[in-house]
A protein has these predicted regions:
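Bacterial N-terminal signal peptides
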Residues: 8-18
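N-terminal secretory signal peptides that target proteins for export/translocation
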Residues: 1-6
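Sec/Tat signal peptide C-region and signal peptidase I cleavage site
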Residues: 19-24
Length: 297
């Protein structure tokens, strides 16, 4: 196994897997669009208080599932949350910080909002509202919640949410491992989870992104860390696409997102982001599910 150390590689490997094939189908991308099985059920709450590292807070499992209360394990990580981020607005605007975490860190199932440009954030909410931004898998809940939320949030709520998340400094919680074999996984809560059985399987042409500690992730800890297992050689292939476009197969990512992939005042950073999330966005642009402003670029 090899663990690359450069943050731009997170974007590179998603590009390396998606762009060269040119004909990825939804079945091929099940790893990027994890779907809960029909018989999926949440674990029951035994009433015990959950803890995460480096936090004095404690929550029951039921409390971490309250969509009208951001689970804030590390209040010192961020400035005071706007009301709509912390608690939403009942009955139909969930707390933004519940899905995306109090400091916007998100997870493989959704977007990391930390440091997104204000103008870009507002435009994405407009695109969700207008129907210009959807998902290639219509029944996928995280995007469905965003579409619903965009239609019930007021412009003022979107404005203060965008200002809050754009003020936060981005950080990464992901390490990349190139390997031919990966742990066996199941889908739980719209993400892949290591079964913990010790069994392995061939990675094929997939990215397998899992939480290092599933309990911390389930507790909605914004500091929960992740591993992205990627096929051998995918990082170098992706890096070529990111930097040069690989002899015309793609526009170099740096053309729009900047030489260090940290974005601009209107274009989002892609450095250090979840490769599963990036893969979904690339595929959604390709299929036309993302057709909003700048998507064609």
């Amino acid at each position: 196994m090899k663990a690359p150390g450069l943050l731009p590689l997170f974007a590179a490997m998603a590009m390396g897997l998606l762009i060269p094939s040119g004909n990825a189908q939804e079945g091929d991308l099940a790893w990027a669009y994890p779907m809960n099985p029909p018989d999926f059920q949440l674990a029951s709450d035994d009433g015990s208080i959950r803890r995460v590292p480096d936090s004095a807070a404690g929550y029951t499992l039921t409390q971490t599932r309250d969509r009208f209360a951001a689970t804030d394990w590390h209040p010192g990580n961020h400035p005071p949350m706007p009301e709509v981020v912390a608690r939403g607005r009942k009955p139909d605007v969930f707390a933004c910080g519940w899905c995306h975490r109090a400091d916007g860190a998100g997870g493989p199932e959704n977007a990391n909002l930390m440091g997104l440009p204000y103008a870009y954030f507002v435009q994405q909410m407009k695109d969700f509202r207008s129907g210009d931004r959807k998902t290639s898998i219509a029944k996928r809940a995280p995007t469905a919640l965003m579409i619903a939320g965009s239609k019930t949030m007021s412009d003022a709520e979107i404005d203060e949410t965008a200002r809050y998340f754009s003020s936060l400094k981005p950080r990464t919680r992901l390490r990349v491992v190139e390997t031919a074999l990966v742990p066996k996984t199941i889908v739980h809560g719209w993400v892949l989870v290591d079964t913990g059985s010790g069994e392995q399987e061939a990675i094929g042409q997939r990215i397998i992104e899992v939480a290092e500690n599933p309990a911390d992730f389930e507790s909605r800890d914004s500091r929960a860390r992740f591993i992205a297992y990627v096929p051998p050689g995918s990082v170098s292939r992706g890096m070529e696409l990111v930097r040069t476009g690989a002899e015309g197969r793609s526009v170099p990512c740096a053309t729009c997102h900047g030489p260090e992939l940290k974005g601009t005042d209107t274009i989002p950073p892609i450095v250090g982001r979840s490769p599963s999330y990036l893969a979904r966005q690339i595929h959604d642009v390709r299929t036309g599910a993302r057709a909003g402003a700048n998507a064609a670029q």
